[in-house]
Amino acid sequence: MSMTDPIADMLVRIKNAASVGKPNVRFPFSKVKLAIALVLKHEGYIFDAKVIQGDNSKSDIEVVLKYFEGRPVIRILKRVSRSGLRKYCGKAELPKVLGGLGVSIISTSKGIMTDSKARESGVGGEVLCFVA
């Protein structure tokens, strides 16, 4: 059976692993998932994201989660644009999360980036998720 929303699956795996205190989490590889994980790393929500070569030439992404005083750094991880309802925003309407304390991850024509980088680049795109 095929998965309908692999990005939502990735986000749920990260959220569930963080809520029970796991040090890391693995999920199947895709270029979009890796780009999202690298944005999370760059923004300081996770320690590391790396590609692990698995059996039968299938790769996984391993994310090392980050905790502060025993609590997960990622408090909110919400999928916005989904397969049944896509959410697109122009450069003027890019959403801010918690008044700028969190980030929106946007898929643009220039790649996957945060809402602030999309504003700097002057591009809009599909709002993939909110992180805080």
Curated annotation (Swiss-Prot):
Chain segments annotated as transmembrane: none
Xref: Pfam families: Ribosomal_S8
Database matches in PROSITE patterns: RIBOSOMAL_S8
Domain of life, per lineage: Bacteria
Membership in a protein family: Belongs to the universal ribosomal protein uS8 family.
Protein name (Swiss-Prot/TrEMBL): Small ribosomal subunit protein uS8
UniProt source species: Xylella fastidiosa (strain M12)
Subunit architecture: Part of the 30S ribosomal subunit. Contacts proteins S5 and S12.
UniProt keyword Ribosomal protein present: yes
Listed GO biological process terms: translation
Keyword Zinc: no
Biological function: One of the primary rRNA binding proteins, it binds directly to 16S rRNA central domain where it helps coordinate assembly of the platform of the 30S subunit.
Cellular compartments per GO CC: ribonucleoprotein complex; ribosome
MF-aspect GO terms: rRNA binding; structural constituent of ribosome
Keyword field: Ribonucleoprotein, Ribosomal protein, RNA-binding, rRNA-binding
